[in-house]
Regions:
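Non-catalytic architectural context of zinc metalloproteases
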Residues: 2-47, 147, 256
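Metalloprotease/metallohydrolase-associated module, dominated by Zn2+-dependent proteases
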Residues: 10-11, 28, 46-144, 161-262
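Active-site recognition of the HExxH zinc-binding catalytic motif
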Residues: 148-160
Length: 262
């Protein structure tokens, strides 16, 4: 029996009516998906203690490369390596708008000259205790969550290699479901802004922070990886409608103290 989320786009699998037309096994039984994902996770944790910690303490460049190599071998029979020649897997602390991103540049009419899967370090190192809901799957650990995000980017890579483009909604979901059991493309993880709001840090909040041996008081106007705080200052470059002047500071969230309303 076909699961309901998959049924909506099952007709799109007609473009691969015979599974043996693809250069890898498709679709995979759910038990096989779980087994292969567990093999990847076990191998990565065995070679990188920092990645195995909860929360994740660190991840080596070699671990990112090993992750791609294992997925290509276990799920794609080497197809990605053959199609692209090389895919760089990198970790970016500046990638905060998404948990991962697939990028490529073409050379000539069809051959792909360079491809990269950029994973968000900001996402990885904020994960703590599960369960986490990503792409329709519930996973227990930060490491599994990271793998599920990586699988999503791999689907972009394989769709692009097979069809010359990626992002065709129904086709992409068919691939993601058949390869990894994904039934959605969204996650329920809180954004930095939502996490900060739960601690009272949101635009309009009054805060204080230490600066050059003193304490400054201001108002939060934006929350991201850091907070933008406007501090009243007669010589400041910013002015409000009442004519008051301010200096703008970008402050790490952990350095801010929310001031209670009196």
């Amino acid at each position: 029996m076909i699961e309901a989320p998959f049924y909506l786009f099952h007709h799109e699998v007609l473009w691969m009516s015979a599974a043996n037309e693809l250069p890898f096994s498709f679709p995979l039984p759910n038990s096989e998906i779980l087994h292969r994902r567990a093999m990847v996770l076990s191998a990565l944790c065995a070679s990188d203690e920092g990645f195995c910690a909860v929360p994740v303490a660190s991840i080596r460049k070699q671990t990112l490369a090993q992750m791609l190599r294992l997925y290509d071998q276990l799920f794609f029979s080497g197809f990605l390596c053959h199609a692209y020649g090389r895919i760089d897997v990198t970790l970016s602390q500046r990638l905060t708008s998404s948990a991962g991103k697939f990028m490529y540049a073409r050379s000539g009419a069809s051959r792909l000259s360079h491809a990269e899967i950029r994973m968000s370090g900001d996402f990885l190192f904020r994960l703590n205790k599960g369960p986490f809901l990503l792409n329709g799957l519930s996973v227990a650990t930060p490491q599994e969550a990271f793998l599920v995000v990586f699988e999503h980017e791999l689907c972009h890579a394989v769709e692009n290699a097979l069809f010359g483009s990626t992002g065709q909604s129904s086709r992409f979901l068919s691939l993601a479901h058949g390869l990894f059991g994904h039934t959605d493309t969204r996650h329920s993880l809180p954004t930095r802004m939502q996490e900060a709001a739960s601690e009272g840090l949101s635009p309009g909040a009054k805060v204080c922070f230490c600066y050059q041996g003193g304490v400054l008081n201001g108002i939060v106007t934006y929350v991201g990886k850091t907070a933008t705080v406007m501090v009243e200052d007669r010589g400041g470059a910013y002015r409000d409608r009442q004519g008051r002047r301010y200096t703008k500071y970008r402050v790490p969230l952990e350095h801010l103290t929310v001031q209670s309303e009196k």
